[in-house]
Amino acid sequence: MSKVSNGGGDSKNTLYCSFCGKSQHEVRKLIAGPTVFICDECVELCMDIIREENKSSMVKSREGVPTPQEIMAVLDDYVIGQKDAKRVLSVAVHNHYKRLAHQSKNSDIELAKSNILLVGPTGCGKTYLAQTLARIIDVPFIMADATTLTQAGYVGEDVENIILKLLQAADYNVERAQRGIVYIDEVDKISRKSDNPSITRDVSGEGVQQALLKIMEGTVASVPPQGGRKHPQQEFLQVDTTNILFICGGAFAGLDRIISARGEKTSIGFGATVKSVDERRIGEVFKELEPEDLLKFGLIPEFVGRLPVIATLEDLDVDALVQILTEPKNALVKQYQRLFDMENVELVFHDDALRAIANKAVERKTGARGLRSIMEKILLDTMFELPTLEGVREVVISGDVVDGSARPLYIYAERQDEKGNVSA
């Protein structure tokens, strides 16, 4: 029979969680087994792990290959809008599964992979789409930051480190790693720094693009299991990158002006009406993206050629940001409501408050990424005061609170005095 301890007792008899090492005084509950103890926090963590496992199994169809609709349905639960980008990713991941299944059959037709480029303004959900994909697929998946990469032999991360991380995600199972998916973020930051490549060696721009070419196309990479620079004597693992799907993403600041300039040249005549880039939303401009625009931006032709599928994401308007605040399973409002619920307080946002928060994010041009910092600033004083206040049962946030012209409204629970009179 397990015993539950609520703390108390002298220090000699203090019990500790066998998993995290916290004492019974640091946690709310400590559950005793025959020889071990586990605290309520570790139980919560175990439940989260099991929930994640259940999510992964949800997207498998009976044949073992999730359909594009199944993948998109899960993406819809977490990512608002960006329908076109989600369709592209869903089809790409589905085809990746099918190609892997096809590899095991003897066939004279070789299925080539189609790497993907995601283009969209900052804060529109490129990275979040990749993070959500990582949770729902059952092949090794890693995210790499292009800004940390340098050409081999220079200070920084080698391109081979990407394959090493994938190998680690596959628990050093080479077969599984060779069937994985790699997301390279901030790929726009490795654009060529100058139109004249002979001026100076561009080790973090064009040099990285050149280094990425082979592993994206398909090559056998020699990967040091412990990192090559610190352990030069170790044996190398051979990883074939032919079947690894690469997804690249970037904000490509300034690309909209390159696209618009091309459009202005082609739209000449008495009936031509051309909106300037300032009059159009960036996402609208990105829909007209052509490979030649990426070349002018600074990507080399060979690199653009390795990314045959281009998906553009739209910038988020006020309505979309309000949806992001409230609708996804792990929406920001739900997260803060859960935090307040731990203090037994209900957090309520008025509709005008949500729109005011969304408007601020649009003004800052930070997209969904800026929502959390705005929420933190609004709720900071409340979160500071709340643990020491007694009787608060509800906190109400209105549009005036977001604008800074009012304080959050605290609603207290009714209390009875000794004579039975009720007071707020």
Swiss-Prot record:
Q: Which GO terms describe its biological process?
A: cell division; proteolysis involved in protein catabolic process
Positions contributing to Zn(2+) binding = C17, C20, C39, C42
One Pfam family from the UniProt entry? Answer: ClpB_D2-small
- One function term, GO molecular function aspect: zinc ion binding
Q: Does the keyword ATP-binding apply?
A: yes
The source's superkingdom equals Bacteria
Q: Which GO terms describe its cellular component?
A: HslUV protease complex
| ClpX-type ZB domain location | 5-58
Q: Which InterPro entries match?
A: AAA+_ATPase (IPR003593), ATP-dep_Clp_protease_ClpX (IPR050052), ATPase_AAA_core (IPR003959), Clp_ATPase_C (IPR019489), Clp_protease_ATP-bd_su_ClpX (IPR004487), ClpX_bact (IPR046425), P-loop_NTPase (IPR027417), Znf_CppX_C4 (IPR010603)
Sorted keywords for this record are: ATP-binding, Chaperone, Metal-binding, Nucleotide-binding, Zinc
Q: Which residues bind ATP?
A: P121, T122, G123, C124, G125, K126, T127, Y128
Main role?
Answer: ATP-dependent specificity component of the Clp protease. It directs the protease to specific substrates. Can perform chaperone functions in the absence of ClpP.
What is known about its subunit structure? Component of the ClpX-ClpP complex. Forms a hexameric ring that, in the presence of ATP, binds to fourteen ClpP subunits assembled into a disk-like structure with a central cavity, resembling the structure of eukaryotic proteasomes.
Family note: Belongs to the ClpX chaperone family.
List the protein's name: ATP-dependent Clp protease ATP-binding subunit ClpX
